[in-house]
């Protein structure tokens, strides 16, 4: 919206939002849906994972900034002036309540409470006590996106019941899956075929609960892999859908020119990090 108002090319900003949300969310267990799932399935402490993933995540954000600045340097050098809409309504009371509830959810999760329960109670509290009618909240739900993911989860359930995983196991013995490079490649490829959340649902069967380093690698690499293609993560799809509603088309080619080399390079660094350094 802001880019359209000031008449600048919105593509670099949209790419930055989508890719930065993937890279930034990789450093915690509450940053995205697949990491929440991994946090609940594994025995990895949230603080330990943050210390392990944060350096890669911060490095990735720097690399993203440099890549977009180089690719779109002419578009980003354009000067503009933006005047905010004075008629915009800010619910200060609701904003303060939301910040407090969010902080409490994070604190409860860090001390050991189940994230899904604390987040659900927090959301229910805000929905009940908000001065905004629930109907207005429901209007902003992207049901098309939800239906698409429901379909993906149904496909994953079909794969689980079909015996395909047993067939894969016959070609790839479990001890091979403990090799970080091979496991990382599988996570990256699967994340861009069925998206990262369904990929985690499939790959969880190959990781013993006590293999903390593999859980950490899966959380970090399945999220970073979301930047490889447009279909790699839900964040990409949300950004593209919102842009489309504003008449802006983000093409796969535009995304690949930044996302593909960035993801490959950052994935190699991540594998080296987990294999030799961390």
PLM features per residue range, with description:
Residues 1, 15-25, 53-58, 154, ...:
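Transmembrane helix-bundle signature of multi-pass membrane transporters/permeases
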Residues 1-26, 37, 200-220, 250, ...:
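Hydrophobic transmembrane alpha-helices that form the pore/transport pathway of multi-pass ion
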Residues 6-11, 47-90, 100, 228-278:
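Juxtamembrane and boundary regions of transmembrane helices in multi-pass small-molecule transporters
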Residues 16-28, 85-94, 145-159, 215, ...:
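Small-residue-rich segments of transmembrane alpha-helices in multi-pass membrane proteins
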Residues 21-24, 58-70, 97-111, 122-130, ...:
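Hydrophobic core segments of alpha-helical transmembrane domains in multi-pass membrane transport
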Residues 27, 53-61, 113-123, 220-235:
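Structural signature of hydrophobic alpha-helical transmembrane segments
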Residues 29-35, 117, 192-203, 230-238:
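Transmembrane helix boundary and interhelical junction motifs in multipass membrane proteins
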Residues 101-213:
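Transmembrane helical segments that form the transport core of multi-pass membrane transport proteins
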């Amino acid at each position: 919206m802001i880019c359209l108002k000031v008449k600048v090319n919105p593509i670099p900003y949209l790419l930055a939002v989508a890719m930065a949300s993937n890279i930034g969310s990789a450093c915690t267990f509450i940053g995205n849906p697949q990491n929440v799932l991994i946090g609940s399935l594994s025995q990895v402490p949230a603080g330990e994972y943050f210390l392990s993933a944060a350096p890669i995540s911060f490095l990735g954000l720097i690399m993203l900034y440099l890549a977009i600045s180089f690719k779109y340097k002419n578009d980003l050098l354009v000067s503009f002036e933006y005047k905010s809409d004075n008629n915009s309504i800010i619910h200060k009371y609701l904003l303060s309540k939301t910040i407090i509830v969010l902080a409490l959810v994070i604190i409860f999760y860090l001390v050991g409470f189940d994230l899904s329960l604390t987040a659900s109670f927090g959301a229910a509290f805000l929905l009940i006590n908000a001065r905004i009618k629930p109907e207005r909240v429901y209007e902003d739900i992207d049901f098309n996106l939800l239906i698409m993911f429901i379909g993906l989860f149904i496909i994953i359930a079909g794969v689980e019941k079909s015996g395909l995983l047993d067939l894969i196991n016959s070609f790839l013995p479990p001890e091979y899956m403990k090799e970080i490079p091979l496991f990382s490649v599988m996570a990256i490829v699967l994340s861009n075929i069925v998206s990262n959340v369904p990929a985690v649902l499939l790959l969880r069967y190959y990781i013993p609960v006590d293999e903390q380093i593999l859980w950490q690698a899966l959380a970090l690499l399945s999220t970073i892999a979301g930047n490889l293609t447009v279909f790699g993560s839900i964040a990409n799809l949300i950004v593209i859908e919102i842009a489309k509603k504003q008449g802006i088309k983000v093409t796969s080619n535009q995304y690949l020119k930044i996302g593909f080399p960035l993801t490959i390079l950052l994935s190699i660094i991540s594998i080296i990090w987990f294999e030799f350094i961390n």
